[in-house]
Amino acid sequence: MVLNYDVIIIGGGIVGSMTARFFSRYQLNILLIEKRSDVGSVTSAANTALIHPGYNAVTGSLKAKMNLIANPIWTQLAEELHFSFDRCGDYVVAVGKEELPKLDALYERGKRNGVPGLSLISAEEMRKREPFINPNVSGALFAETGGMIDPFGATLAAAEHAVLNGVEIRTNTEFQDFLFKDDRIIGVKTNNGDYSCRWVINAAGLYSDMVMHKAGVRPDFKITPRKGEYLILDRADFELKSIYFPVPTNVSKGIMATASVHGNTILGPTAREQDDREDKSNTIAGLAEVLSGGKKLIPEVDTRHVIATFAGLRAAGNAPCETPGVDYGHDFIIEIPRKVRGFLNIGGIESPGLTSAPAIALHAIELMRDAGEKFEKKRDWNPVRPARPRFRHMTDAERRQLIEKDPRYGRVVCRCENVTEGEILAEIHAPIPATTYDALKRRTWLGTGRCQGGFDITRVTNILSRELNRSPLAISKKGEASKLLVRPTKILGGSHED
């Protein structure tokens, strides 16, 4: 048995990280374990990057309740934790008169859910607001509380803030099984040893069903990964003003077109269920579907505008809504099961899971309070995570001042995104260190421009090698199985370290 904790959180995605952040407010010894080399690197890093108003969730469901509570919290979180967030509002766009009744239905559902700031607007008004929109638009639903966010940035910010307030995070640490004493969970087994605790919180995302089955809970619950494929367009081609959904289908919210906090336009996602929980590959059929759906909203979209593709997996579950009278079979699970003590179970957190994460964390605290846990506030808890400089967002005067303090901020490593050596070093030596190329990419946005890392990757590899005191051959893209270099090339004079 290694160390003893009050709470162990399994999973470092947005739900696990936000839970760690909110729990760090209290006098608890907390450990978060994440099986990958970085927090937030799966579903929380590859999604549509939106904060939903709440008009889509089925009335009476836990999704609807969590969405409504969490939506306004994001404004304060962005201010305190310093991640990118823009409450620009969002639109559901009808193309053709036959789609207008669906807008009315969404509007009425939003009102029933208590969503503020909803309005139905005319086709003429929609065309005025967004010049790129399909000229055949017949009307739109506008929700002023919708927003775009950096989802990985928010996850990292929450996790780092938790660390700054005393939470311990162990990456490359994979949950294997529970330790029991009678009907109580007293710890977890991992690939790095055993850890004892009084409470375990399951926030394992795509693997949350497997974790709960290990606890002997909900044997019929199943996560089915739902792949969503996306296209990223060059920011020079389109500058959309907001977020644009088509009218939704029974399976998903449809192929949307959205601006992003990084300036690019994003199209997607598809919604295809699969068995593989790791396969995030793109497909020809999937990308063709995204392009076709994107053209329905923004007809000028063309493949020549595409600079990158990606895919993400949503943890779609089959849990029925437990609100009496609500027939809905895909609700969130947030519970303390009766049959096992010391276990708080979170699962099936698909959309609007990102939006709902703060409310899920707060709900977890209330459930544990109801179960008898005492939450005593820390006197020295700091609500703020310090901001780190982002060179591309600074004025010339601010840049000069920063370079005077640290000349490394004057060395541009990624030209497309204007990322400097100073920014890279700050992330390598941050509370949650970036130790791979992709970890730096998610934090600084290097390698995401038109050249897609062609200019910076060798420079970043050298910086990581130097700062981590490792051979360049040991530097990876996203973990041990993804080394960037295979062997030194034949050289004339000097050595491969030069």
Give short role names for the model-derived ranges:
Residues 141, 145-199:
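Helical element adjacent to the flavin cofactor pocket in flavoenzyme catalytic cores
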Residues 252, 261-262, 273, 278-412, ...:
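C-terminal catalytic lobe of FAD-dependent flavoproteins
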Residues 410-424, 442-461:
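Local cysteine-cluster metal-coordination motifs and their immediate loop/turn environment
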